[in-house]
Amino acid sequence: MPGSTSAGASRTPPLAWGALATIAVCLLYVVTLAPTTALWDASEYIAAARVLGLPHPPGNPLFVLIAHAFGTLPLPLSYAARINLLAALSSATAGGVWFILIDDILLKAGVATVRRRLCASGGVLLGASAFTVWNQSVVNEKVYTISLALFGLITLLMLQWLRSESSPRNDMRLVAIALLLGAGYCVHPAGLLPGPAVVIAVAYRDWRRFLQPRLIALVAGAFVLGLTPFAFEPIRAAQQPALNEGAPTGCEHGLAWSCTFSEKTYQRLADNVNRTQYAKPSVMDRQIGFGPQLGMWWLYFKWQWLRDSHGRHPFGQLVLALVVLGVGLYGGYAHWRWDRASWAYWAPFMFTVTVLLVYYMNFKYGFSQAPELGSAVPREVRDRDYFFLWSFSAWGVWVAVGIASLWRRFTAGAGLLALAVIPLAGNWSAASRRDDTVARDWGADILDSVEPYAVIVTMGDNDTFPLWYAQMVEGVRPDVTVIIEGYLDMDWPVHQLLEAPIHSYDSERGPAIYRGRTWVRPTRPALNMSLAESDSVPDYTEIREPQIFRSAAVEGRVQPGYLERKDIFVLRLITDAMPQRPIYFTAGSSYPAQFGLQRYMRTEGLVQHLMPTPVGDSSGESLDVDRSEALWRQYHGPAAIVRRGEWIDRASLVVPADYALLGIRLSDALDRDGKHGRANVVRDETIAVIRAAGMEELFGLPRK
């Protein structure tokens, strides 16, 4: 009861068994580990670790420091695989703690040792093989696996505090928890999620702890100490690393005392930590109803136990999810009956990482949710299941307790242990990233599509991260200047563009099609303006009448309306960079049409090249057949897509679609030129890409 210790307080937790569980889970992840980067944020975070840089706000400084140190270990793995291994170890650590927690709960219930270990093993396996947990643990796509490890350590400390006699020494575990909460916030703001559960559990056992000034001071001090990695951000930002998103510093020309401790640095750091640039609505300003938001969580919960990506087994997926949900809820009830002390922590924690987190994140409809509603509802740009991996991993604890309780009542309840094996078998092909090199190959393919010293304007950051990875981690084409069009609305990307070093082109490492020519290294940045001049560019300017845009190389037409800051910079880029630097746009960019430049555009592989003279009519750009065919032959992406097989993430389908569209266009052009044999080769390779990515319906092909 409150104010007392639990029976069995002197028992040492089964750390050896927890370690074995950690090793077993880690082996599963190592067998299915990604050999390199992946789509979405993985490339950004791996690159940030490599160059000791700053990823997108809030900057995740503790992750960067941990990953950078881990990446220096002399392991027989590529740099990316080492960072992926860090994700695997982190998730596996949480699995070991869940084993200890389950064993402890069942010991309180008087469950026999063998049965305890079987149920704990099943619960750990179930949580570890949940689709999102598994898929995120074999590549460092986010920082959430390190957060999961910290949640596990906090849980272990909390369990020990609840089980031990009251003493100042025992209370030091609360101080350690406060330190981990602060440090967890430096990994990701979600690091605070266990906080409410800790407070409730402490209040349950002995609310008088909140009246002890010394303990409160130690806890507060430890929490603040845990936040100190944020000091890394302005210090490192001032040194201008290759990856410096948000640039949270007032220092423009190197680290100095005066600019570091300035109002400008404070404001930029605060904006970075608070993610001000994303302008996320208040939690009180609901983007959609709470019901559909819970529906999104339920969709992702169903995915965990059988990731039926093509909808072939919807009924089986639903039944399995209902069983896992029901057994878990029953396990929560059994937990409450058997062990109120740990339940006082674990139940609030589970509520926080499920219901409360759903409400707080305030997402729009999920990318895959309610497809029948189409574009009639606001949607996230991708499925956000990764935000809930903590609840999916931890759900295995209550499922294990539920199985133990049912097994005690019914001998047949032992059969529920089979639940633990179903996700392992059903999710293997979907969760494994063992042969996935698509993101690395795609980034390198785009970079190798452009001429030396080119400038390439990309549409979004997620499309650009693989290019950053290729440049910063693998040294592919650092001579290319990569510009994200949306970032040009902010000052720091423009400043970095103006001050970026110009790397020499390495013809030996570059594509064969660019060899045998002399490429002159540019002498100035792609944008030829001062920092002050760039800061004076307005957020937008109104165009009342059609305007002719002329540079030394091209002539376009700007229609009436509003030019945003990014548009102004792109026009200035065309003026300043050409003809010294070739300019490219990624496929799908709206700028050629927006500025009336279609007749200057020539498709070369995966990119559009802005030529200095017209190469087509005003209806659209032309295709450089010879160069595109040469690029197609050197591209690694199509083979990687076929090798990967099932394309689970439909939100990133643009990647295989870009290859497929190029292949279709190229094969048709080769046919028109009478090169039917070469056309058939490209067409067959394109069809293989379409089928591997499951795009038959999109491209009008019958399913096999």
Regions found by a protein language model. Name each.
Residues 33-45, 55-67, 261-262, 434-438:
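Extracytoplasmic catalytic/substrate-binding loops of multi-pass membrane glycan-assembly enzymes
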Residues 5-20, 115:
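N-terminal membrane topogenic signal
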Residues 15-28, 121-126, 351-352:
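Alpha-helical transmembrane segments
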